Amino acid sequence: MTAAPHILLVNPWIHDFAAYDFWAKPLGLLLLAALLRQHGCTVSYVDCLDRFHPRTPATDPQRRCGRGPYLKTRLPKPAALPDVPRRFSRYGIKPEWLREDLWSLPRPDLILVTSMMTYWYSGVQETISVLRDIFSDVPLILGGIYATLCREHARRNSGADRVVGGAAEAVLLDLVADVTGFSPAARFDPQDLDTYPHPAHDLQHRISCVPLLTAKGCPFACAYCAAKKLNPDRMTRSPEGVVDEISRWHRDFGVRDFVFYDDALLAQTEHHAVPLFERVIRHGLKIRFHTPNALHIRWITPAVARLMKRAGFETVRLGLETAGPSRWLEQEQKVTADEFQRAADSLKQAGFAKRQIGAYLLAGLPGQSFEEIATSIQIVKDNGVTPILAHYSPIPHTDLWPAAVTASRYDLAADPIFTNNAILPCRKDSFCWGTITRLKTLLAD
């Protein structure tokens, strides 16, 4: 058999008007790194978003529960967005640091680059350009969310040799064999999450938090969400496996902050979330849980809220979307004001403070009125919960995409840069700071 290859995995820069590390880690890429190590490969990891790079000022990784600002470098604004009066930046380490890090590595046999938001693709392009300068003859494969949702655009514009959509772990060993000739027998089952190794968080310079995925896929099919496209099949892990992972990172690396990346953590509550929370409680782990992806409100009962509190939940985010009528939310999935109140009351009675509970409200949907958003904000505040606006970003392959294309002042299908939620892409008129200011005033009142 061909000798085990050296594979470089890279998390690219972000190019955007604004970006902040709200527990953002390239979980999929770090899982691939773990799988490659499990099968005998040598792996190297470079994170262009590394807030703890050796060249940055020392920062406590546990500050802000693992969150924090990225290093920022001003860039020219994209020529396609002249109507947006905001500064555009590269977020992440300096280019010269990246080049130094790459020069210090042995030549890899294969490079794997991930991607996140579709409208961050210029950051992917710049990252790949630097990789090409250093390792011009090394095969480079691009995967991730942008590669999945905008595959043809990525093929034409990213600079990668190959673009892979969907769950890369299912085809990882075949890709490695095809490029390098190294073909070990699989030591995991892509359809059984309990056979996967723990993601290789130890490759990071510092571990500020550990993202957890207790299940893949979502039982819902919301019109604005791409979860079904990204992970069409629902697969769950055993509570024992999840707690073993938590215990390892807490015990061996001192990690306190754990972040659920699940699309539907509370789905099948009695068979999945409840046993998990109970096992965490029995282990007596002094840790903090955060739910930036939002919890489904209907599944939060007084009993579930009490378990969450005892298990160590610190940051609770609820997926309200809108408290008013909406043609974009299926009626059976729409949460009523009464259901929201019951969930909020359950959390508060369990001991959660107002600062710990936030409700996401979608803003900027096609045809959505300012009054609808204002009504939703007031309902959230009336229930003693913090409203958090989630500005809508149009996503290809979702049911809402055609309406977004019709509503936008941009040609969304022509360039993913136009789907950036920071530019309010579904307004027919030009970008307006007044709308943002009015919404911020409502949130603050």
Spans of model-derived segments:
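Acidic, low-complexity intrinsically disordered segments
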Residues: 2-255
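C-terminal accessory regions of radical SAM enzymes
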Residues: 8-14, 19, 24, 46-56, ...
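Residue-level recognition of beta-strand->loop/alpha-helix junctions
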Residues: 47-52, 229, 264, 319, ...
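Conserved beta-strand positions in the central sheet of alpha/beta enzyme cores
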Residues: 112, 164, 259, 317, ...
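Active-site-proximal loop/turn and secondary-structure-junction residues that shape catalytic pockets
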Residues: 117, 146, 264-266, 295-297, ...
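Catalytic cores of alpha/beta
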Residues: 151-158, 304, 366-381
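Glycine-enriched alpha-helix->loop->beta-strand junction motifs that scaffold or abut catalytic
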Residues: 159-160, 309-315, 383-386
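Radical SAM [4Fe-4S] cluster-binding motif and immediate context
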Residues: 194-354, 358, 378
